[in-house]
Amino acid sequence: VDIAILLHDHYDVKIDFEKDSAVLSADPRIVKEELEYIQCLSYNEAKLAGMFGMKILDPIAIKEIDDNNLDIPIVITEMVKPDGNVTMIKKNPPVLEHANPIKIVTGKRNCAMVRMESTASSHLVASLQLDRQYHDFVKLSPYVIDDTEMTRLLFLDADYVRRHERYIRAYYPQTEIVYGRGVVTLIGDEMWRVPKIASTASSTVSEHDLNILNLDAQEETSRILIVVEDKGTSVADAVRAIHSTRTKIHGLK
C-alpha cells in the first residue's frame, strides 16, 4: 500500500492481493450455507469488516490511502481461481441494483465495554487516537443517568484494556469496565435504505435464545452493532442466525 501511494502520482496504480478466497458475506469457518461472493466494497465497508473480525485487509492500510485523499483500487483475487471470483475495493464503488445492502455479517470475540462520563471519554479518545495511535474501539450512543451524560466505548481487544486499566481509569476514577463481551456487526453503506433492519436483526438473535446486551445502529456509520455475552459459541451462533435471514431482510427493501 505504501508503495502504491508513492507511485500514484506517476502511474495508474492498482493493488492486487491474492488470497484463498475473494470476500464472502461471512467468515466461511463460521457460516457454511448461503454464502455470497461480494463483488464490490467501499473503503469504509472494508475498514469496518477488518475492525470487526473479517480478515480482508488491515484497516490501517485503507486508512493510509484515505489520509492521503487517494482512490486506489484494491482487488482481492481468489488464488485457486484467478479468473474466477474477485472483489473490488474502491472509495466509492458502484451501487449494484440487485445487491444485498447487508454486505457482510461478522463477529468479534474478546471485547470489553468501558463506561465513563462523556467529557472524560472525549479526552481518553483523543489521547488514544492522537498520542497512542490506537483505533481499535468504537464510541457507542451516549445515555444520561442522574443528569450526567455517560459514554460507552466498545474496545475490540479486551487484552489491551486489561493491560491499560490504570491509564483508562486515570481519566475517570468511577469508570466501569466489563469484560466477556462479543459483538456481531452488520456492514453495508446502503443498509439505511432497508426499513426495520435493526429490529429484524435483533429479533432474529433473540429468537435463538441469545441475550442482546446492547444494540447500536447509526445511519452515518454503515454498521449495526449487536453486543452479546462472549460465552461458548454465542458470537458464532448470532452470526449464523443473522446471516441466515440476510436474504429475508433484503426483501424488506
Residue ranges with predicted function:
Residues 1-253:
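C-terminal catalytic "cap/lid" subdomain
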